[in-house]
């Protein structure tokens, strides 16, 4: 009886991988999660880089000025804030994208699991809030300029500055796109943290 019991313990039933929800193995689910995180990281990087480039090149000539006069993105503090935060997110998401590629290619995390999971989750949360704050301030400034409540150089409207206001709003829209994918990344890293505390 004992030998039969041992034979059953080493039989096909115990060699079958542990199957979880929807019949996916734990390894398959983990790889799918890593792939999704890589896509979200890459999109966050792409949108934040686009926001930086569009805002950083936003310089227009004021056509109705009696002499040559330009308005640039750094003439308004909210637009500086948008540029700076998107630049930070761009660098952060580039590093995280590289880490995601490493995880996908090697099948393991570069850093100790506990440290990297909490590092990713904490920074995703903090940077997502920072990015939302910057874009909210930026869009408020863009609306004030568009409505004429705030004037460029104290006397010129958006229509006098070519595509200045439009380009600023495009940059902010790209920033909100980066926020969306950073928030989705934060959701996935949050699930990784939560799994440690779920029964």
UniProtKB/Swiss-Prot annotation:
Transmembrane annotation, as ranges: 36-56, 81-101, 125-145, 170-190
InterPro entries: CASP/CASPL, CASP_dom
Protein name per the record: CASP-like protein 4C1
Top-level division of the source organism's lineage: Eukaryota
Bilayer topology annotation: Multi-pass membrane protein
Subcellular localization(s) per the UniProt record: Cell membrane
Key word Zinc present: no
Family, per entry: Belongs to the Casparian strip membrane proteins (CASP) family.
UniProt GO cellular component terms: plasma membrane
Coiled coil: none
Keywords: Cell membrane, Membrane, Transmembrane, Transmembrane helix
Subunit structure: Homodimer and heterodimers.
Ranges in the topological domain labelled Extracellular: 57-80, 146-169
Spans within the Cytoplasmic topological domain: 1-35, 102-124, 191-199
């Amino acid at each position: 009886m004992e030998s039969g019991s041992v034979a059953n313990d080493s039989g096909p039933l115990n060699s079958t991988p542990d199957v979880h929800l929807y019949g996916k193995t734990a390894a398959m689910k983990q790889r799918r999660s890593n792939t999704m995180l890589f896509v979200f990281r890459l999109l966050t990087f792409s949108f934040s880089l686009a926001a930086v480039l569009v805002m950083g090149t936003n310089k227009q000539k004021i056509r109705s000025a009696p002499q040559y006069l330009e308005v640039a993105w750094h003439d308004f503090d909210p637009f500086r804030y948008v540029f700076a935060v998107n630049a930070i997110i761009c660098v952060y998401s580039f590093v995280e994208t590289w880490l995601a590629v490493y995880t996908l290619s090697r099948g393991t995390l570069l850093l100790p699991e506990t440290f990297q999971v909490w590092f990713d989750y904490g920074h995703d949360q903090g940077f997502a809030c920072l990015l939302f704050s910057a874009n909210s301030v930026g869009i408020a400034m863009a609306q004030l300029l568009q409505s004429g409540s705030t004037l460029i150089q104290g006397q010129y409207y958006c229509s006098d500055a070519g595509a200045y206001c439009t380009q600023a709003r495009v940059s902010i829209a790209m920033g909100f796109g980066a926020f969306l994918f950073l928030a989705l990344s934060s959701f996935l890293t949050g699930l990784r943290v939560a799994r440690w505390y779920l029964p």
